[in-house]
Amino acid sequence: MNERFFLLPKEKQQAILNAGYRVFSRNSYKKSPMSEIADAAGISKSLLFHYFYNKKEFYLFLWEKCAQITIETLKESGCYEQEDLFETMYRGLRAKVRIMKQYPDISAFVVKAFYEKDPAVCGEIQKSCERYLTFKRNAKLLRLDPEQFVPGLDLQMMYQDMYWAAEGYLWEKSQHGELNVEEMEQDFVQMIEFWKKIYLRREG
C-alpha cells in the first residue's frame, strides 16, 4: 500500500476504514465494489486506488487494522491483566463498545470476513486468525481457577460454550443489518450474568 495513507488526517483515515467495513460487511468480497467504498468515504475511486493498489490489499489491510485496533483497546481496558473470567468479559465488552462507536460496522465485517469463501482472500484470512482463535477457544490458556466454579465442571467445555454463544449472537445480528451497540451491550450483560449464575460456585 501507499504509506501516504498514514499522512492523511485521522478523521479521513477513519472515514475510509469505516466505508470499507460498511461495504464489505454487507456484501461478499467479490460483490463489494471499490467505487461504492470510495463514494461512502467521500473520495474518488482513483484516489482510493492511489492508497491501496487493489481490492485484495485493501480488504486484508482492513482485517489487520481490525486486529490492531482490538488488541490495543483490550490492552488499554486492562483485559490482559485480569484473572477473573467474568471481570475480563465485562472489560472486553466495554472495549468492544468503544470500538464499535468509532467503527460501527467493524464487528459485522469480522464475522463476514471469517466466513468469506472467495479464494482470493479466504486462505490469508484463515491463516491470520488461526492463532487468535486458538487462544480464544482454549480455557487452559486463561489460568482459570477451578475453585471459583461449580464442582466437576469441565472448564474447557464451559468456555467453548460461552465462546460459541457470543460468536453465534454476532453472526445472527450481523445478518440483519447494522449492529445496535446499545442493544448488543445489554444482551451481553444479560448473558454474562446468566453464565455467572450457572457456572460460579455458591458460598455455603
What feature does the model see in each segment?
Residues 15, 23-57, 61:
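Helix-turn-helix
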Residues 12-20, 37, 62-70, 136:
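Generic hydrophobic, amphipathic alpha-helix propensity
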Residues 19-23, 99:
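Short amphipathic alpha-helical elements of helix-turn-helix/winged-helix folds
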Residues 1-10, 203-204:
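N-terminal intrinsically disordered/low-complexity leader segments
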